[in-house]
Amino acid sequence: MSAKKPVQSKLNIGNPTIPVTSNRSTAPKPVPGQPQFVNQEKKQQSQNTTTGAFRSNQNNANSGGNGNFELDDLHLALKSCNEIGSAKTLFCFFMELQKINDKIPSKKNTELIKNDPQFQYFCHNTILCTEQSYDEKTIEKLAKLEYKLEYKNSYIDMISKVIKELLIENKLNKLQTFGYKLVNNEFGNQNHLGMMQQNQDSSHNSNFMVKCDYINLNKQCMITKNWEKVYFYLGDHLFMHIYKEYMIFLKTRDESLVQISGTNIFCYLNEKLGRLQAAFYEGPNKNAANSAAQGSNPEANDLISAEQRKINTAIVMKKTHKYNIKAADESYLTNQEKGFWDDQIKRNRLFYCAHQNRFFQKHILNSKTLSQQQIRDNIYKEVFGFNRVRAELKGKVMSIIEQVIVNQKKFDFKYYLSKNCPLPENWKNLKKSFLEDAAVSGELRGQVFRQLFEYQQDQRQISNFLTEFVANVFPKNFLEGKNKKIFNKKMLQFVKFNRFESFTKISLLNKFRVNEVSWLSFKCKDENKKFFMNENEHVFFKVLKWVFEDLAITLMRCYFYSTEKAKEYQRIFYYRKNIWNMIMRLSIDDLLKQNLKQVEKKEMRIFCESQNFAPGKLRLIPKGDTFRPIMTFNRKIPNQVGKFQSRMTTNNKLQTAHMMLKNLKSKMFKHSFGFAVFNYDDIMKRYENFVQKWKQINSPKLYFVAMDIEKCYDNVDCERVVNFLQKSDLMDKEYFILNTFVLKRKNNIIVERSNFRKLPIKQYFRYKFQKIGIDGSSYPTLFEILEDEFNDLNMKRTIIVEQEQRKKFPKNDLLQPVLKICQNNYVTFNKKQYKQMKGIPQGLCVSYILSSFYYANLEENALQFLRKESMDPEKPEINLLMRLTDDYLLMTTEKNNAMLFIEKLYQLSLGNFFKFHMKKLKTNFALNLQKIGCTNTTQDIDSINDDLFHWIGISIDIKTLNIIQNINIKKEGILCTLNVNMQTNESILWLKKKLKSFLMNNISFYFKSTINTKQFANITLSKLYIAAAEKYVACCQEFKRFHENTSLGGQNIDIKIIHIIYVVIRSFFKYLVCNVKSPVFERDDYQQFFIYSLKFFITRFKQQKNEFAGVYKILKAKEKKLEVAKIEFQIQ
C-alpha cells in the first residue's frame, strides 16, 4: 500500500539528516546464473542518508500531523496497552499544542526548532505517555493559560519543586521521587506517612524539606539543554504538568526506551509485580505498621487468612489440574492448545548418562518395597494425575500397566540388545588391541579415538530394539495393524530427533487411528460420541507419553550414551555403554596427565560447603581424533535458605563479578587492549575500518595468517591472571552495580498498525531483572550507559527502568569468588571426583573474559610492532590482527610482518607454556616453518589459500576483501541445525518467525556496500535461501500435519504457506535496505530481488510436489506474473 499524503501542520519541523558520501567499489561483471539488479547510480548520487540512530528514525517526520509513521514497534506496543492512555513523541505533542494554541511554541521558537537539527532529533526520540485514568482535557486547559517563565533563571529549582510536590502528595511510585524523602522542620525526621497525617493543609507545606538519600539520575536526565529548551517553549504550567504527570521515555541508539519520569511502568505488568514494586517504594516500615494494625484486629486477621487460603488453593489447583473434560461439546484442540508446554515429551533425561546400570534397577516397575497393585496405582496416578477417566477405560489401562509390570521382568534385554544393536565384531580382542595401541604413541592413540568414535549406533537399530521391547512387554492388542506401523515410525523419528527437538501432543498423535485401538472402544449414544472420542484421545496420548518419556528414554539411558559431536551442530549420536566406557577410560587418562587430579569425595565436600560452591560436571564431546572436555556448573549450591537462594548455582553466584568483567571486556575493545574480539559485531567493526584504509592506499597485496591456540582455557595461568587483574589500568578499585527492570517485547505478539486494539501490557511484554556494572569513578545515567557504542548489553527492543540505589563493590571483593573457583575447581565425572590443577574451567560464565584478558596481556608485550602503520601511498603499511577466543587472523601489507608475527607467537607460546596447532596454520603464501624452530620442515600445501581465505565461518576474497558466509548447503548439514518443535498455539505466527530466523540471523554485514559488492552479496544470499527453503519445507510439513483436521485445512494451508513466503521476502528486503547502513541493494531492486528469492522456494517445493502441489503451482504462476507486471517497494 502506498503511504497517505501527510497532513500539513503549522509547525513544520523537518527530520534531521546528515549527508554522507557513499563510498562504493566499481560493480563487478555479471556472473551467469545470478540476478542483475537495477543500476542506481543517479539515485545514489542524490540520496542523503543518515548515520547511526538518525537512520533508524528517517521516517519519523514524514507524516506531518497524523503521526502514524512515527510509531516504531515499542512505541506502538505502548500505545496499544490498556494501562497507557496515550503515547506520542515530543514532536507530535508540539504539533497538537499548536492546534490548541498557535502561540505555543511561539513563531520565534518554531524558527529556532527548525534550525536546530539536534533538538529535532531529540523531539523525535522522546516519548510522552499518560496513564489510563488521565484526563486529556487537562492539557487543553493548561495550553490556554497565560504563558509564564517564572523559573527562567532557576530551571533546576523548578524540577526540585515538582519533586517536592510529588512527595507531599504521597506519590512515591513516581520515578522522580527515587532517592528523596521529606523531613519536617517542626517534627524532625519522621516517616512520610506520619507527616502527611499531621499536615493535611497546604499551608504547612513550607515546613517540609526534601532530603536526598542518594542521587536520582532520572532527575539528572531532565537537567539538560534540550529539556531546558522544552521548558522555554512550553512555559511554567505545561512543562511542570508534563514532568509531574507524564511518563517520559528516551530512545537509545539500540531502539530501546529508558524511562526517566512518571509511574514506574513495571508496576503495570501484573498484580504480583505491582506489590513487589510497592514494597520497594514504601519500604519495610509500612509492612510492619500494617502487621501491627492487623494484630490489634482479630477479625481483620481472619478475613485476610480466609482470602489468602482461597488464593493458595487456586494456585495449587492451577498447578495440579492440567486437563479435564466436563462436557461433550468441549473442543479437544482448544484444550490442547492451552496446555502446549505441558503436553510436550521431555527428552532432557536422555542425554549424557554415563552410568552402567541394569534396566529399571531403580525404576518403580521393579520396586521391592511396593506390591504389584501399589506399583500399578502409583504409575496410573503419575501418568494421569487428577484427570477423570470413565471406569471401564480406567480398568483397561490398569490392566495394561499390570501386564507391563509382569512382562518386563521376563523380557530378555541382553538377547534383543545384541540382536538389534550388536557390538563391533570380535569386541573383546578389539578392546585389547585398542588399549595396546593407545599406550604406544600419540598418533596411534588419536587413531584409536577416531575408530571408537566411528562405532556410533545406527538409529534404526536402536528404534528396532525399543519397538521390540514394546511389542513383547505390552499386550498384543495395545497397537495393531496400521497403528503399529505408525508407532514404529514415531519411535524412529523420536530417536532421530536433534538435541532440542521433541514431540508435542499434536505431532505425536498425528496419523494414529485412535478409533481403531481395541482397548479404547466404547458404546454410547450418538449425542455422547464426541465426548468419548475426546476422552480416548487424551488417554491414548497420556499412555504414549508414558511409553516415550519414561520407558523408551530409560531404556536408552541404560544401554546407550547420547551426545553431540564437534562440528555436527545439534545432531545426536548414540554409543553402546561398553564402547563409551572405553572412551571415558582413555580420556580420563589423558586429562589426569594434562590438568586433572583425582581427589577424595570428603576433600571436595569440605571445600564446596565452606565456600558455598557446587562442584561442576564433566562430560566429553567427540572431536575427530581427540575429545573436548565440557564442564557445566548448573548444580544448585546445597544448604541454601530462601526461595531464590535455594536455586542458586555457581554461575549465579558469580553474576555480580561477571558484570564487572563485562565492563572490562568493553574497555578492552574500546581501548584496543590486546587484539581480542568477542563476537561478529566486533569483528566486522574492525574489518570494515581496515577495508576502508586498504582502499585509500590503492588496495595493495595483502598477506594472510590464521593460527589456533591448542587447549586455550587449559593453558591459562591462574596466578598470572590474578596478577594481571590486580595491576590492570583498565579496572577501577570499585564498581557500581545497577539493578534495572527490563520489559522485553514478545516476538509472538504483533501489533496491527492499521487497526490495533488495546490489550494488557503483559500481552506485549515479558519482564526480567538485569544487572549492569560500571566504573566506581563515574556515575553516568542509565541513558548515557546505553548510548555508549561499546556497551556490552543486549538491550534491543526493551523498556528499561533503573529500580534502586546503585550499590558499590570493591574490586577485590568481586574478584574473590572468581579466583577461588578458578584455583579450586572441583568436578565429578563417572562417579569420581577430580580437581583441576591447570587452566580455568571452561563452563564458567566469566571464563571467556578471563581467557581473552590473559592472552591480551601477553599480546601487548609481544605484538606491538603491528600497531605501527603508515598511510603513505608510496610505502603503505597497515595491519589487522584479531583473536576470537583462540583463533587468530592477521591481514597485513608487509610479508615481513606476517613472518615475524608467526615467529613471535611461536616464541610466546614456548615462554608461557602453551601451544599452537601448527598443523592448522594457514597462510596465502609459502613459508619455511623450520626457520622459527618448528619441527616441520615444510608447510602443508592444503594450508595455503590462494583465492578465498577461510576463518571462523567467513570466507575472505584475497584480492578484493569481499566476504562470503560459509554455510553447509547439503540437506543433511542444513537439517542438523534445525529444531522444528512446532508451536500449536499461534502456529501461523510460529511458521513466519521460523522463516524470518532462517534468513535474518546476524547477516547484515554481508550486505554492506562498504565491505561487499553485489556479486559477493548474491553468493551469500543464494546460500541463505538454499538453507532457508530446505528448513522451511520441513517446518511446513509439520504445519500441514497439524492443520489437516482444523478449519485451516485444505487449500487454505497452501495459501498461508505462500503468504508467509511473500511477507518474509518483503521483510527481508526491507531489513537489507532500511536497517543496514550503506546497503548493497537499493529500493528499485525490489522486483528482481523478489523474483530471485521465489526461485529457491519454487525449486524446493517442486521436489515435494506430491505433498505441496498447490504451493508449487501458485508460486510458479506468481513468478510468471512478476516477469510482466511491475511492483514497487514502499515502506508502510
Swiss-Prot record:
GO cellular component: chromosome, telomeric region; telomerase catalytic core complex
Limits of the Reverse transcriptase domain: 602-956
Keywords tagged on the record: Chromosome, DNA-binding, Magnesium, Metal-binding, Nucleotidyltransferase, Nucleus, RNA-directed DNA polymerase, Telomere, Transferase
Subcellular location per the Swiss-Prot or TrEMBL entry: Nucleus; Chromosome, Telomere
Disulfide bonds: none
Chemical reaction(s) catalysed: DNA(n) + a 2'-deoxyribonucleoside 5'-triphosphate = DNA(n+1) + diphosphate
GO terms under biological process: telomere maintenance via telomerase
Superkingdom, natural source: Eukaryota
Binding of Mg(2+), residues: D708, D886, D887
Glycoprotein is among the record's keywords: no
Location of region: Disordered: 1-66
SMART domains: Telomerase_RBD (SM00975)
GO MF annotations in UniProt: metal ion binding; telomerase activity; telomerase RNA binding; telomeric DNA binding
Composition bias type Polar residues, residue spans: 9-26, 45-55
Keyword Nucleus included in the entry's annotation: yes
Short name of one Pfam family: Telomerase_RBD
EC number: 2.7.7.49
Main location: nucleus
Family annotation (Gene3D superfamilies): 1.10.132.70, TERT catalytic subunit-like
Signal peptide: none
InterPro entries: RT_dom, Telomerase_RBD, Telomerase_RT
UniProt-listed PANTHER family: TELOMERASE REVERSE TRANSCRIPTASE (PTHR12066:SF0)
Family statement: Belongs to the reverse transcriptase family. Telomerase subfamily.
Function: Telomerase is a ribonucleoprotein enzyme essential for the replication of chromosome termini in most eukaryotes. It elongates telomeres. It is a reverse transcriptase that adds simple sequence repeats to chromosome ends by copying a template sequence within the RNA component of the enzyme.
Name of this protein: Telomerase reverse transcriptase
Organism: Oxytricha trifallax (Sterkiella histriomuscorum)
Gene: TERT
